[in-house]
A protein has these predicted regions:
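Boundary/linker segments flanking structured domains
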Residues: 1-37, 45-49, 60-259
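Active-site ExK catalytic segment of metal-dependent nucleases
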Residues: 53-57
Length: 259
């Protein structure tokens, strides 16, 4: 259940700080924030150009692999990232995240859910939905193919397309999602883009709460095709905590995204 694009850019020496912030927002071991399974994008901070679109069952762990913090896995972009940093100070990084209801089973949460499954006398597979993992494969295929159709080639660091199922589901406006990954200055005209960076949300639980609230409206926009204002009105009807009013009073809806 995708909905929110969260943008940031980091220096080479800030990679571990970024990884910790991603893990804070998208941990597989808790049920708040967002699911650990999602789409990510590396982009040229200076040219505002997509370099790579990928998927991960565990976004924080995959980021660490790409940046050489964890042992290299197949498909790691560590060499490309090192080459980029040899010529540039900052690298753009964006995550396209899902609701925690889409959290799949990954190695970091397996022990927790094995314990729950044993207590419930149920197969561990029954404890979590695999829909989240299936969705990221499909969405990755859609986004890479939409880029290829628009520009005539894959992103620079992508050597192939994604899911064949995803490739057959591309719609003309899907390229707008791809462009949102690397164009932070256009945040105000794109309602799926967070007004705070990955690290800002990690440092500010209230802002994270606001973006989690808006995620529900974004899901309705992307999944049901509702207009954003209509989706927002719909979720506000059930806002028993007064989250949206608090958001308005705090000035968060006027906050500028600075990456």
């Amino acid at each position: 259940m995708f909905g929110t694009v969260i943008i940031d850019a980091y220096r080479k020496e800030e990679a571990l700080e970024m990884a910790d912030a991603i893990d804070d927002l998208c941990s597989p071991t808790d049920n708040y924030g967002w699911a650990s399974a999602g789409i990510y994008c590396f982009w040229d901070y200076y040219a505002e150009a997509v370099l790579y679109i990928g998927l991960a069952g565990d976004l924080a762990e995959r980021f660490k692999q790409h940046n050489g913090i964890l042992p290299i896995k197949e498909g790691s972009k560590q060499k490309q990232i090192e080459d980029y940093f040899s010529r540039n100070e900052r690298l753009g990084y964006t995550i396209f995240v899902q609701s925690p209801l889409s959290q799949p089973l990954v190695h970091r949460n397996r022990k927790v859910y094995e314990k729950f499954a044993k207590q419930q006398n149920s197969p561990i597979e029954d404890m979590l939905s695999e829909q989240g993992r299936d969705d990221i494969k499909r969405v990755e295929g859609i986004l890479i193919e939409s880029f290829r159709r628009k520009y005539g080639h894959f992103p620079l660091w992508n050597s192939m397309g994604g899911s064949m199922v995803g490739q057959t589901k591309v719609m003309e406006n899907n390229i707008n999602i791809v462009n949102s990954f690397c164009q932070p200055d256009n945040y105000a005209i794109n309602p799926i883009v967070s007004r705070s960076t990955i690290r800002e949300l990690s440092r500010n639980p209230e802002w994270e709460w606001y973006e989690n609230y808006l995620h529900a409206a974004r899901m309705k926009l992307l999944i049901l095709g509702m207009e954003y204002d209509e989706a927002l009105e719909f979720i506000n009807k059930n806002d028993t905590l007064g989250t949206y009013e608090r958001m308005k009073k705090s000035g968060y809806l006027r906050k500028r995204l600075i990456v």
